[in-house]
């Protein structure tokens, strides 16, 4: 044993940890004994000899390479990979290889100050005995984020930004002349002008926009958007272009289209919706047992020329973003809320899929057509559910005419029956049933949440969902299946025409096994192998068995993680979750750019056009998939913000809850009354030292053997509500 300069005795483990940290901090460098002893302050002969012995063992393990009798360097494996860096708030950063392999741990000291989403090149360290696999970032290839959002702190000689979220791990220094008028307490957007290096560890930036005072609702929502690089302002030149659009529907244009203005037509949307991009028409065909159901979609691309300034902006945004209290539209307001919105009693241009269906919702014939419609009525989902669940006489006056609103309730009931038939067949074919409840808020005029609740799937939402699914599937089959033979080629030997598909791969087998391990201790079963149909039916049975239990949310969450993410691609592999061989997004061009691409391709091919450039469309698909994920992350952050804001005035109050998650650092608890979730940290679990039993998802007291397990009922007290960090902290109520 040696002695440290402070008199503390050094043991082998301590010296090994010191050496490991030193060599990892200098990857690729040769360090001499003299440098090592000086850096680690190993001044005594016993301490130096202990360090030499440990380095010899590390070399024997291939973790170090011996350069000479008095020098070593870190042994980096020759394997070099590129991929994405993922930063975590708990310090457990990782590297995700491009080849789809498992994430690899990256210690903070080996991260080269990489941020989440950065493209990096790494080298792998030789793996020490009983240690996890680690990677070292050797080069940052591309920065994902060059802007940060946070709170300004202005001092006498300098200023800095305390960044929101987990993208940045350090404050950003700002020269006072680069503040753009920002003051202490302001939320601001800062552009990074200098990244950390070996010479300077500081992040330096300049203010590009002052959002306003911290805590203001609009400021905070804009801050969330800015944090993800999403636009919170609409460019004036794009708005001007939208204002100049000619919206006249001429007689010549109507003559080129199928006319549905006298056919019973209506929209069903959320009660607060403004952009109505889909409508349904319904009529019984004369001298036939069939019904005609039209799925009418706003003809957005009729108004937006490909390559125009409006089109380029929509392409860049790729999707509308739905925060808790606002929508950030993909298109200018004049287009999405007025010109293209299928508002009642207004003539509108549509692109439509018209089905002839029998009583059992079997498609006997269909056609794709550009149309003109005039909606008779605008329904909210709640109104439709009331009609469908009511046996009372029709609440609307009837004039007896085909297009009158008096015909609507009977039409709704027939369409509801058909939708349920379509839904049943879909699940029998192997579709996975994820009816997840979504957390929603009632918001007052100041943007403050007054109530939080779960929205559930209803017959009204399912009615719209099933007919939209039918339209999306049908047009995808029209292109993808019609021209293909068994070899994936068209009859003349050429490849099928380029198209945009919505694809969803089969579940990851390892993640299915993880799901099985999670649910097994609670008596649930799930298949991890077999046919696609067998696995999906097993998943559906699991969801059904967990329905209404305290474990429902957890099981749904873990099951969703086992599923691959759906995305856009020109390379079709089908949609596993829906059990469709061909699927696309056709029905929401107001809010999704892929739907605009689909409309353009269908129009081109209907007119006899040649196949579009696949590489170009694949690039657009990749961008759209990426932007969809970014938008979802921003939406989740807005929910977290409102959840913490809702609980901010309830600190000190007690609630019944249940354990919704177990981690090595504490337990997550969901309040039964309002579904808000917070953390009880390990340090707040008094009376024992608790160890994490990862296999059984529980914490176990070392002395008392008391367990905190998933699903357990628990009484909590709200301890802290940190709105800036979007974190809720609970403690046990009996403390």
In which residue ranges do the predicted regions lie?
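Charge-lined substrate channels and their catalytic hotspots, especially those that engage the 3′ end
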Residues: 2-294, 301-346, 378, 385-386, ...
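Electropositive polyanion-binding surfaces
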Residues: 38, 189, 194-196, 213, ...
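A short macromolecule-binding patch
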Residues: 102-107, 168-174, 675-692
């Amino acid at each position: 044993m040696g002695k440290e300069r402070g008199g503390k005795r050094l043991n082998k483990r301590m010296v090994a940890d010191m050496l490991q940290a030193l060599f990892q901090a200098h990857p690729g460098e040769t360090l001499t004994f003299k440098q090592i002893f000086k850096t680690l302050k190993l001044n005594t002969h016993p301490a130096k000899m202990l360090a030499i012995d440990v380095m010899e063992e590390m070399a024997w393990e291939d973790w170090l390479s011996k350069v000479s009798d008095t020098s070593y360097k870190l042994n980096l494996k020759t394997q070099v990979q590129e991929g994405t860096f993922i930063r975590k708030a708990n310090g457990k950063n990782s590297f995700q290889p491009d080849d789809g392999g498992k994430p690899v741990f990256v210690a903070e000291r080996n991260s080269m100050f990489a941020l989440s989403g950065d493209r990096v090149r790494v080298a792998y360290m030789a793996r020490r005995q009983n240690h996890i696999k680690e990677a070292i970032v050797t080069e940052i290839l591309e920065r994902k984020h060059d802007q940060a959002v946070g709170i300004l702190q202005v001092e006498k000689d300098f200023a800095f930004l305390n960044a929101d979220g987990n993208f940045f791990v350090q404050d950003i220094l700002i020269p006072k002349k680069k503040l753009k008028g920002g003051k202490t307490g302001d939320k601001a957007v800062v552009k990074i002008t200098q990244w950390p290096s070996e010479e300077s560890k500081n992040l330096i930036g300049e203010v590009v926009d002052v959002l306003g005072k911290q805590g203001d609702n609009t400021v905070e929502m804009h801050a969330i958007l800015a944090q993800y690089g999403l636009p919170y302002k609409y460019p004036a030149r794009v708005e001007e272009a939208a204002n100049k659009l000619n919206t006249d529907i001429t007689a010549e244009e109507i003559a080129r289209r199928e006319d549905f203005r006298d056919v019973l037509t209506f929209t069903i949307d959320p009660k607060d919706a403004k952009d109505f991009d889909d409508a349904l028409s319904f009529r019984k065909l004369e001298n036939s047992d069939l019904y005609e159901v039209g799925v009418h979609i706003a003809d957005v691309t009729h108004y937006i020329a490909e390559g125009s300034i409006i089109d380029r902006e929509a392409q860049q945004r790729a999707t509308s973003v739905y925060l808790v209290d606002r929508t950030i539209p993909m298109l200018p307001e004049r287009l999405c809320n007025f010109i293209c919105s299928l508002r009642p009693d207004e003539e509108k241009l549509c692109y439509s899929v018209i089905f002839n269906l029998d009583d059992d919702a079997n498609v006997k014939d269909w056609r794709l057509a550009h149309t003109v419609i005039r909606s008779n009525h605008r329904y909210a989902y709640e109104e439709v559910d009331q009609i469908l669940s009511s046996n009372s006489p029709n609440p609307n006056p009837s004039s007896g005419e085909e297009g009158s609103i008096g015909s609507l309730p009977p039409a709704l009931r027939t369409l509801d029956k058909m939708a349920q038939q379509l839904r049943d067949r879909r699940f029998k074919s192997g579709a996975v049933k994820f009816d997840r409840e979504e957390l929603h808020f009632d918001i007052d005029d100041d943007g403050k949440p007054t109530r939080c609740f779960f929205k559930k799937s209803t017959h009204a939402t399912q009615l719209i969902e099933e007919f939209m699914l039918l339209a999306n599937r049908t047009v995808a089959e029209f292109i993808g299946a019609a021209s293909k033979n068994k070899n994936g080629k068209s009859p003349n030997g050429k490849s099928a025409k380029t198209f945009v598909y919505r694809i969803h791969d089969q579940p990851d087998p390892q993640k299915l096994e993880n799901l099985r391990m999670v649910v097994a201790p609670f008596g649930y079963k799930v298949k991890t192998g077999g046919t696609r149909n067998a696995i999906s039916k097993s998943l559906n049975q699991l969801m059904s068995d967990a329905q209404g239990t305290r474990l429902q949310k957890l099981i749904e969450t873990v099951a969703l993680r086992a599923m691959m993410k759906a995305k856009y691609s020109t390379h079709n592999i089908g949609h596993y979750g829906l059990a469709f061989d061909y699927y696309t997004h056709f029905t929401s061009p107001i809010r999704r750019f892929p739907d605009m691409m689909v409309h353009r391709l269908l129009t081109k091919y209907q007119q006899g056009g040649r196949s579009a450039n696949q590489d170009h469309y694949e690039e657009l698909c990749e961008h759209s998939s990426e932007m969809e994920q970014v938008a979802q992350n921003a939406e989740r952050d807005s929910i977290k913000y409102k959840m913490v804001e809702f609980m901010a005035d309830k600190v000190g109050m007690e609630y019944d809850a249940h354990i919704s998650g177990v981690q090595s650092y504490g337990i997550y608890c969901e309040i039964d009354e309002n579904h808000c979730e917070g953390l009880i940290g390990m340090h707040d679990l008094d009376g024992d030292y608790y160890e994490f039993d990862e296999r059984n998802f529980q914490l176990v007291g070392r002395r008392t053997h008391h367990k905190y397990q998933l699903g357990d009922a628990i009484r909590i007290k709200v301890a802290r509500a940190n709105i800036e960090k979007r974190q809720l902290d609970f403690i046990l109520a009996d403390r």
